[in-house]
Every structure is written in structure tokens, then in C-alpha cells.
Amino acid sequence: MNKKTVVAYAAGVPNANKSPHKTEVLKRFIQGVVANGDKGILHAGQNILESDVNMIQGWVHANSVLSPHLKVRKYAVEEARLKGKHSIMCDSNLFNYDVGKFHPMHYSRYSMDGVFPTTGNYFSDNPDPNRWKQIQQDLGLSLKDWRSNGVHILI
């Protein structure tokens, strides 16, 4: 079996980042790659390396001003796509609005090849019906009755 090479781009995290979680998810993802017998690289440079899979934290939108960290994200995703390979994105915790950014239980979103429902694969074809119950318990969240006024998230 051929080993796959996975590169996580630490330079895709903004220099002014104050959340250790953003770089920690990249580091732990690479540790998991290595633990499963493949080659994992946590890359601090801004150049794009040869790989089978590129991983970024966050996303870059089409009309974003390309600061250095956003260029790394953009080029990592583009390079994989042009070569017929994949990108993994770790995007923000959906529950930051309620529990804050530094809650010890992080539920980040991971997707492949995009972050939108029409472009990304969230591997959600067979969801675990108990998963929401676990998240509610871990974060102390509860669903509220449907309402049509105010600010809300529809689940």
C-alpha cells in the first residue's frame, strides 16, 4: 500500500491569531495521519508542497483581499484541485456564538474540497443520531422552539 502525503499549512493561520486551537487542530490532524501510517507534514512555509492531500484551517472567499495567510489557503486548495487531489478544511466552531471561542470542548467543522453545502463534502451521509445529544450535553446547549423573529440558527 502506498503511503499518502498530507500537508497541513500552518502559514494559513493569521499571524495575529490569538486562538491556539487554530494551529493545534493542524498539528493534531498531522499526528493522526502519522499514527495511521501515512506521511504527515506540518508546514510553516508559504510555499505549496507536493502532496496527496492539503489541509488548511479556515477558508478564503473568492472576493477576499489576499493577505499572506489567505494566499497560502487559496494556493493550497487550488493546487490540490488542479492536480485532481483533495483538500481538507477545518472551519470554525458553529457554537462559538454561545460558548465562546475558548471553550474546552471544540466542535470544529471538517470538510473536503469546500466549505459550502454545494461544494464541500462534510461526510454526513450517515449521521449518528446521538451526536447532537452529546454536543448539547458537552456544551450546555438546548434547542429553543421555532420562532420567526430575532436572530437564530436553524438546525
Residue ranges and their predicted role:
Residues 1-154:
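Catalytic-core helical/loop segments in enzymes performing group transfer/polymerization on anionic/lipid-linked
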